[in-house]
Design a protein with these regions (language model features):
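PLD/PLD-like phosphodiesterase catalytic module centered on the HKD motif
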Residues: 1-180
Length: 180
């Protein structure tokens, strides 16, 4: 993702469909998302406890009063201060919560399908039939430490990048159907 995002400044959106989302994956990917305006993640069959907690709490105050937001953030701060997380995890949690609160990150679990696909769509805000800088990456990598190759116990992953506009549009249309 680093090279792709650094060399394609017009890319402003990341949509992903993954079977597994691990905090380690989001925390690793996050430094490269500063130029991205919107991240939408559709999660399939497994979400770890950090993601579940952040997402559930985030949904509690979307559209709610400012007082509820502040109460939750105070509660989260106490939880983190009293935990044994590393500073990397703590920073990642704060960034993830901030991304959820700001609307930069949206997480959904599909209500009826057990999703196993791994698809990453990167495209500009004005993506259309004439766009040349969008891409779809599909393969075996979930958004996890293993999937991104950062874990000690690395596993073989195989992914393919599709750049033809028709392929990207097809993947984007499929994502929108699942997201709806």
């Amino acid at each position: 993702f680093e090279g792709l995002l650094e060399n394609n400044p017009n890319i402003k959106n990341l949509d992903s469909v993954v079977g597994f989302l691990r905090a380690s994956g989001y925390f690793t990917l996050r430094p490269f998302l500063n130029s991205i305006n919107k991240v939408r993640m559709l999660i399939g069959i497994d979400v770890d406890k950090y993601i579940v907690k952040a997402n559930n709490q985030g949904h509690l105050f979307f559209g709610a009063e400012e007082e509820v937001k502040q109460d939750y953030l105070t509660q989260l701060r106490k939880d983190i201060e009293n935990s044994v997380y590393s500073s990397h995890v703590e920073e990642g949690i704060w960034q993830m919560v901030d991304d959820l609160v700001s609307g930069k990150l949206e997480l959904r679990a599909h209500p009826s399908k057990k999703i196993h696909a791994k698809i990453y769509l990167l495209y500009p805000d004005n993506f259309n039939e004439w766009s040349t800088d969008g891409c779809a990456i599909t393969g075996s990598s979930n958004l996890s430490g293993n999937g991104l190759g950062i874990s000690q116990d690395k596993q073989y992953e195989f992914n393919v990048m599709l750049r033809d506009n028709e392929d990207v549009q097809f993947a984007k249309d499929e994502f929108e159907l699942l997201w709806a």
